[in-house]
Amino acid sequence: MTESSPSPGIRASLNEAGELVLTAMNAPPEAVIRMDVNADSPRMLCTQGRYLAPVQAPPGARIRFRLFRGKRGITPPETFIMPGPPPARAVPSTLIPCTQDRDFMIYDWASRHEAACRIVRETHPNLLFIGDSITHFWGGAPVDEPHRDILQKSPETWNLCTAGMRAVNLGFGYDRVENALWRLRHGELDGAKDNAVCVVLLGTNNLAENTDGEILEGIRAVCRE
């Protein structure tokens, strides 16, 4: 009698820093964990960001996660609640850094993040544009293949406006403030000049879910990075 293989799953644990660590168990090599934090309304986890690093979230935060192969879930959705009493004032989502994958049809968020980190390390830019699709679709590096024609709306004006500067485009389509905060805390500024100028244009994609004050708090957190 042939012994069946163990079913895939996800192990959730806390590291010494109190961050949530998610580990895929018995999973195929191409499987990825997708997750969200404090989702107030049901969202399809297949469009949420990949788990790429331990999750920083306040006590009481709800982290949903599921293992996917492509966009098909291969484990049931699970929820982990961060231990400890929740703060008296709920921490807005704009201050909880997380990944996303809402624009997966035209670009890969995680791959663009890796490319941006590499370019910043190698070129030591002195001008960085941090934003969402309005910035992303302008021009400049990194370039998302194979959709260059869709995502590079005006490379000529980018070249004109950044002439003489080592500029990097840190705009990511459909990013909310908390997604940019995650990116900056995970390497996208590592290697930039100490006196680099950062141009921040964020918040549009938060308007449906956050108050103006919450968006402002998140933008301030981004600027402090």
Q: Where in the sequence are the language-model features?
A:
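Conserved beta-strand elements of the Class I
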Residues: L128-I130, V168, C198
